Amino acid sequence: MKISRILLAAVILSSVFSITYLQSDHNTEIKVAADRVGA
């Protein structure tokens, strides 16, 4: 099911991007969250 994986990855990336955009002053927390996701 490549399509479902692509959709899941898109949702994760969009959520991470929104978190980084809304909390741009918390860089360390964002980096930890990104590392957990695997980015």
From Swiss-Prot:
Induction: Expression is stimulated by conditions of low nutrient availability and high cell density. Residues 1-34 form a propeptide. GO terms for cellular component: cytoplasm; extracellular region. Transmembrane segments: none annotated. Contains a predicted signal peptide cleavage site in the N-terminal region, however the propeptide is probably subject to only one processing event, at the N-terminal end of the mature peptide. It is found in: Secreted; Cytoplasm. It comes from the Bacteria. Intercellular signaling molecule that inhibits excision of the mobile genetic element ICEBs1 when cells are crowded by cells that contain ICEBs1 and produce the PhrI peptide. Secreted during production, but the mature peptide acts intracellularly, indicating that it needs to be imported into the cell to function. Acts by inhibiting RapI activity. Belongs to the Phr family. This is Phosphatase RapI inhibitor. The gene is phrI.
